[in-house]
Each structure stands twice: as structure tokens, then as C-alpha cells.
Amino acid sequence: MSRLTCLAFPGRSIPMAVLERLSVAARELPASVRALRAVPGVDQVLVLSTCERTEVYAWWTDEADPAALLRALAGQRGLGPEPLLEHAVGLTGREAVQHLLRVTAGLDSFVRGESDIVGQVRAAVQAARAEGAVGLEVQRLVDAAVNTSRRVHRSTGAGLAAGSVASTAVAAVAGLLPDGLAGRDLLVVGTGQVAVSVVAAAREAGARLTVCGRDPERAAAIAPAGARVLGLDDLPGALLDADAVVFGTSSPERLLRAGDLGPGLSEHRSGRELVVVDLCVPRNVDPDVRGVPGVRLLDLTDLRGAAVPGRRPSAPAPAALELAEQIVAQEVDRFLHWWVDRAAAEPVRRLRADVEACVREEVARATRGLSPDLEPLVAEGIRRAVQHLAHGPTRRLLDAAAAGEDEVVALLAGLFAPSAEEDQAVPAYSPQPIGNTSNAAASATPRR
């Protein structure tokens, strides 16, 4: 399993300014996938970018070179490798499989058990498949991750905290308003999945909704009956009367700056505080908005904290969390067993084919000139002897594959089946830290 590597940049431990630069919007995924697949040795690649993380999963045809992968990612995002090395988490084999399964099940999210991530994983593999960057191995890995999420949520029920980043944002807004959200004016900016989730949570909380989008028709499509629909040009005026605004777009641009909130804002609002929540990466709201009197700004970093009124930190029931982790472990083993069978199948087939060819040659040679009644006895003796000699290498090859000993698998396949040199199904690989690079500034090893 050393052919699978993951470079992870988790939002909980990486500065927002760096995460913004690493964030890959849906429209940018094809270019990112192409750039990363162009790294020598990369056969398949998956790029997962959400408001909480950016991760790259690579399946290699030859010896893995995570340092090259990191340099390619940095270059594609217009960064040097040095800032990324400080925050990169490198995972290989079982750890990489386990990580994707935990992420997809919502167990690595700051809202434990959230299910929005499943759709994001599916979108990531769909984008990679469109670029021809998904083969059987990565597809099976994603299938395992989605199945794990399904099992976790079905098996744990209400024991695993149900919610999302959107519902957490709405709860935070309700906690900051004197009388909650019921009957208050909430402005939602965006028309994508995040905005849809915010609208649903706010509607349940009883808010009066206004949906604002670059495309008013798309805004109207997600707005519930009775909600106002506006274009982005109407945003400044809408802020004058809103009690709160939640940004949930995929735009890489700053849509709200301190200068957009003129000096008359506080006077017009008669001293009412405007709550602004930015769920976007890159951020839609410039951090300088924090300095505007009468405005309270929350971004994802704030929502991860426990000090925000209304923010209820995810606290799954211990039994549910334990069950979820058990399910992840089971599905990791299931995927690895599939991989072992696949990795060992071709070398074993070649070995057995060579054994059969050897038996046929030796039988033909040994029985030449023998009487017909002796031929079967000699042939059977030769067959048993050769198969007995081949049993040990075959068993060792299967055991090595099961233990993830790729070097041993490749060695045995080469020794006992010479044609294995032409097949790269299970190449030898010695893991190297990301920092092993000729770039002196990029010589550090990523955190584990």
C-alpha cells in the first residue's frame, strides 16, 4: 500500500491566509488535477478542497516522491514550497486510507458527523475522473469512503452529532441576536450547497430570509416561498436592514470590505449590531470589517472556537464515536484485503504459469522413449516435485502482499517469474519524507 500517498493541509492547524491560497474552487479542479498528475510517477490523483481542508491523494506507478507532489501543488497555487512544508501532513498506505475514510464520515470535521463532506468527496472524484486521473484503485478507495460514511451514519443514528458548518453558523447568529433568529432578517449571500444549507437551517429557526446571488435566477431557485431575492449589486442596500448576513459563495473575491460599510451604517441601523458570518475559503469578507463599529464578524476560525454564543461544540456520545471508529477500521481492512488480493494475483498467476510450463517441458523430456504405461507415473512425479518446490515461494508471496511488503513481492515475482520485470503492478518502494529534495529550503520532513 506504499503506492498511495496523501498530502493533507487541515484547516484546524493551518493559518487561514495559507488555507485560502491552497483552496481549489470547483472550476479550478481540472487544472489542479492535470498539474498534479503530470508529476513523474503519478498514475491517479484526487484533489479534495473544502472550507476545512485541502488534500491531495496520489496513486503512484513507481517509487513515490511526495516532495515533487508538494512542489507541484505549491506551483499550481502560486506558492513556494516552504510555507507548505510547515503545515503539510504526509500519510502513506493504511494511514492514508484511514484518513480519507474518517474525513468522508465526518469524523475529522469540527462539526463531528457532518454529512456535507460526502458530496464534496463525490464532486472531487467526478472532476478527477473527467480528467482521466481516476483508475480502479482510487475509485474503489472513494467507494469505500462513501460506504463508510453511510454505515457510520446509519449505525450511530442520533448518537453522532448531526449538523453542518451551515447549521453551526446559524446557531451562532441566533446566539448573538438578543432574541434569537425567529422573526429576524437574515441575508444569505450565495447560491451553492453551503448557501442552500444555511437557508434550510435559517428557515427552521424562523428567520425572515433574503437570498442574494450573482445570478438572481439561481438565487430564486434556492429561496423558500416568501423570501426576497436580490442580485449582488443590491448587497450594500440589503445590509442596512438585515440583522445578520451569512456569506456562502465559491467566489475567490472579497465581496465585502470595511469601505463598503459607510459611516451612516450605524446611524441608519439605530445602533443595532450587524452580525456578519463568513463561511468561505477564500474569505468573502475582508478581515478589516472587524474594525467597523457596530459590526460583529465571525469566520471559520471563530466558529471552531467554543466562545461564540450559540456555538455548540460537537460532542458525540462516546459509544457512538467508538462504534464509528470501529466501522472505519473494518472498512479500512476491507479495502486493504481487496488491494492485497489484487496486488498478489498477477505475480502468483505468473509464477503458477511458469511452474506449469516447467512441468510440461520436464515431462516431455523425461518421458521421451518410455513405455506408455510408465509415462503417467513419471509425469505425476515430476509435477508433484515441481509444485512442492513452488509452494513455498507462492505462500511467501501471498504473505508478503498481505503484510504490505511491496519490496518482497516484487523480489519474489522477479526471481520466480522473470516476466514480472515487465509488469509494474506492485513496484518496489522505499518511503521517503517529503523534505527529501534538492531544494535546501524544502528539506524538512512534514508533520505526522
Curated annotation (Swiss-Prot):
Biased composition (Polar residues): 433-442
Any one GO molecular function term: glutamyl-tRNA reductase activity
Thylakoid is among the record's keywords: no
InterPro entries according to UniProt: 4pyrrol_synth_GluRdtase, 4pyrrol_synth_GluRdtase_dimer, 4pyrrol_synth_GluRdtase_N, GluRdtase_dimer_dom_sf, GluRdtase_N_sf, NAD(P)-bd_dom_sf, Shikm_DH/Glu-tRNA_Rdtase
Gene3D superfamilies per the UniProt record, alphabetical: Glutamyl-tRNA reductase, N-terminal domain, NAD(P)-binding Rossmann-like Domain
Domain of life, per lineage: Bacteria
Gene Ontology terms describing biological process: protoporphyrinogen IX biosynthetic process from glutamate
Region spans: Disordered: 423-448
Catalytic activity reported: (S)-4-amino-5-oxopentanoate + tRNA(Glu) + NADP(+) = L-glutamyl-tRNA(Glu) + NADPH + H(+)
Note in the entry: During catalysis, the active site Cys acts as a nucleophile attacking the alpha-carbonyl group of tRNA-bound glutamate with the formation of a thioester intermediate between enzyme and glutamate, and the concomitant release of tRNA(Glu). The thioester intermediate is finally reduced by direct hydride transfer from NADPH, to form the product GSA.
Function per UniProt: Catalyzes the NADPH-dependent reduction of glutamyl-tRNA(Glu) to glutamate 1-semialdehyde (GSA).
Name this polypeptide is given: Glutamyl-tRNA reductase 2
Species of origin: Nocardioides sp. (strain ATCC BAA-499 / JS614)
Taxonomic classification: Bacteria, Bacillati, Actinomycetota, Actinomycetes, Propionibacteriales
